[in-house]
Amino acid sequence: MPSISDDDDRASVRTERREAAVAAFLQQTPVIYQRDVTVHPRAAEWATQTETAPVCLFLTGAIGIGKTHTAWQATRQWLAAHITRTGRKPRIETWRSTALFDALRPDSHDWDVRTLTRHLQEADLLYIDDLAAARVSPTGWTQERLYEIFDERYINRRPCLITCDVLPGATANIVGDRVQSRLREMFRGGVLLLEGADRRAGDAA
């Protein structure tokens, strides 16, 4: 029978693992988003990934409202909660939309598209920043890869976090009709409109 000291040791190891993982992730975070901020209660709820929390979170609002800063903070909280719950360090993929769409192009020289697609499908958390900043390729190739990524994550209930200036239902001109339809399903109950003053007037957004 496990003793109390065994439980304490396991808890201590898990705490050390969590703190080390969060510190490492913080070092990978862009400098202006490393400062802690208070996140909206619904974003904090998503980060806990409890049974009542939405699997996916879509942060929207005006330019400069703080979507990206909120997203990085919520991702750190999600990371800590995941390790507390499972004891395992998750794999988190963070991408700016413009870089992601370029990487998914069939003529990409930096990535094997099929390998990258599978990598993004299987990550424990996929965070895409500023979705409205990018546009799909006219050939439809990027649309197909995006659909494969989002569909696989949707059917396996793998968390996604997206920041965007427009609502999921208004993303057709960005990602195409098919992907837009999947996004609307994925983020049902997980759309959060952030409101307030433009933080870029005197701070990071």
Provide a role label for each language-model segment:
Residues 1-48, 191, 196, 200-205:
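A short, basic N-terminal segment
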Residues 51, 84-87, 118-121, 151-156, ...:
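Conserved catalytic network of the ASCE P-loop NTPase/AAA+ motor domain
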Residues 79-122, 139-140:
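Short glycine-rich substrate-engagement loop in P-loop NTPases that contacts/grips substrate
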Residues 90-91, 122-125, 154-162:
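Loop/turn-to-beta-strand initiation segments
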